[in-house]
Amino acid sequence: MVNVTIYDEAPQLKPNEVPQNMAAGADTQLEHMCRLQFDSPVPHVRLSGIVCTIGPASSSVEMLEKMMATGMNIARMNFSHGSHEYHAATVANVRQAVKNYSAKLGYEHPVAIALDTKGPEIRTGLIGGSGTAEIELKKGEKIKLTTNKEFLEKGSLEIVYVDYENIVNVVKPGNRVFVDDGLISLIVREVGKDSLTCEVENGGSLGSRKGVNLPGVPVDLPAVSEKDKSDLLFGVEQEVDMIFASFIRNAAALTEIRKVLGEKGKNIKIISKIENQQGMHNLDEIIEAGDGIMVARGDLGIEIPAEKVFLAQKAMIARCNKAGKPVICATQMLESMVKKPRPTRAEISDVANAVLDGADCVMLSGETAKGEYPLECVLTMAKTCKEAEAALWHQNLFNDLVRGAGTIDASHAAAIAAVEAATKAKASAIVVITTSGKSAFQVSKYRPRCPIIAVTRFAQTARQAHLYRGLVPLIYKEPGLGDWLKDVDVRVQFGLQVGKKNGFIKTGDSVVVVTGWKQGSGFTNTIRIVTVE
């Protein structure tokens, strides 16, 4: 996904020069890295998508418009917080902001809306009958975790309620229990009929309704909670574009979500959030069954050792790249910017390395939901993505992806040919005329250096295209012409006009055009290289 924003200036390049030109033609990974230049011109267009979580700091129409102008592509609603009424107002504001921003651009600018489910989770009960009371746990002390509902609102230094009734059957002595995002750790010493006797390993202040993690323990929580079902049906009513499904452990969970979405929600994309060891072990079946993956590093960093999260991230992204499924990298990417206007150098490297790993999108959470500098966060992320995209060794990645493609159909072969043609011709863009989006998504898989302009008449297809690296989705609203070839040509011209208007296509540039030989989805097999007039 891409769009050109108010901050994207055309780079000053010589004829046939590309950003990081010296590195682009390297023969080895080491040589490629040696040739990277810190003062290379920045690409004109960002190819990675930016997901922004909408909250109190960003939910106004005015702020949403500014975020779109700065680079937001997908608006995420976190259903761990807020009522349906609150989220309905957010959806309405996003759509109003899209209308306002589109009017300024002179064409419809698609922005996707994502519903992030709360998911099945384990939580503690109330401390001392209050939502605000806390207890101080100290290292070496003993505390009981109980499933006895008598203690639901009577948590104390001696005993605290947890809402997972089967915990005594899955946890063994020696297992660790993490509470409150891993800030407090307990070691299980004894397992009783309805309680665990634990020793405090790392103490701290424990409040009410805090999350509980059981790293390495195969839990049997329902894939979709009653709250999730209600939220999913709300999402169908609101016509959201995608679901970010929390704590997905296997492919069966996706089948259950699909059943809840029903016929009316059959076209909603499901992005599986991998947040525990079970999800990692079943990753291949989850990728195959779903529409994409989110590397949800928050809970994942509690469920597995923190020093192994980068391995999980690289494995998830690579497998998604190989399968041609979109992948989002999330959690604490610019965390310090919740309070500060500038990121740490480590955070910039984190964003850049997610792009270099192959992520299609990067995500902001609290940074835009509750932070003091939401616009600065989006701009920082957008600028970092562009630098990283230019530094990627595209030719090597393309060759690896082609080698792993196996036997392919005609439209898939056309996608590979289009990317190779664009590279050889130094094309400014690839224009794809698409109905379902499939042909554009296939081109995206092979990671061209240039933007992919995906022209479609279907608004939801355009919005969902933001999940994929490199796509500039455009909605063509004019009715179809009787002559198929003329109808294709006017849509191609529309794509070229938008590219010229945004400055990344110029007169005399080469552009690769990918179309179908007849009307409908699944007939894409024609490639042309045209010179822009």
Curated annotation (Swiss-Prot):
Which cysteines form disulfides?
A: none
Q: Which cofactor does it need?
A: Mg(2+); K(+)
One example of a Gene Ontology biological process annotation: pyruvate metabolic process
A Gene Ontology MF term for this entry?
Answer: magnesium ion binding
> In a knockout, what does one observe?
RNAi-mediated knockdown is lethal. Glial-specific RNAi-mediated knockdown is lethal. Neuronal-specific RNAi-mediated knockdown is viable with no defects.
Q: Which residues bind Mg(2+)?
A: E275, D299
Which residues are noted in the entry as K(+)-binding? N78, S80, D116, T117
- Provide the site residues for: Transition state stabilizer: K273
Q: Under which pathway is this protein filed?
A: Carbohydrate degradation; glycolysis; pyruvate from D-glyceraldehyde 3-phosphate: step 5/5
Binding of ATP occurs at N78, F79, S80, H81, R123, K210
Top-level EC class = transferase
Give a GO cellular-component term. P granule
* Keyword terms of this UniProt record: ATP-binding, Glycolysis, Kinase, Magnesium, Metal-binding, Nucleotide-binding, Potassium, Pyruvate, Transferase
**Gene3D superfamilies given in the database record:** Phosphoenolpyruvate-binding domains, PK beta-barrel domain-like, Pyruvate kinase, C-terminal domain
EC nos: 2.7.1.40
Tissue expression pattern: In adults expressed predominantly in the thorax.
List the SUPFAM superfamilies hit by this protein, alphabetically.
Answer: Phosphoenolpyruvate/pyruvate domain, PK beta-barrel domain-like, PK C-terminal domain-like
Q: Give the binding site residues for substrate.
A: R76, G298, D299, T331
Which transformation does this protein catalyse, written as a reaction?
A: pyruvate + ATP = phosphoenolpyruvate + ADP + H(+)
InterPro entries, alphabetized: Pyr_Knase, Pyrv/PenolPyrv_kinase-like_dom, Pyrv_kinase-like_dom_sf, Pyrv_Knase-like_insert_dom_sf, Pyrv_Knase_AS, Pyrv_Knase_brl, Pyrv_Knase_C, Pyrv_Knase_C_sf
Its function?
Answer: Enzyme of the glycolytic pathway. Glycolysis is essential in glial cells but not in neurons; neurons rely on the citric acid cycle for their energy needs, and on lactate and alanine secreted into the hemolymph by glial cells to fuel it.
Q: Which family does it belong to?
A: Belongs to the pyruvate kinase family.
Quaternary organization: Homotetramer.
> How is this protein named in the record?
Pyruvate kinase
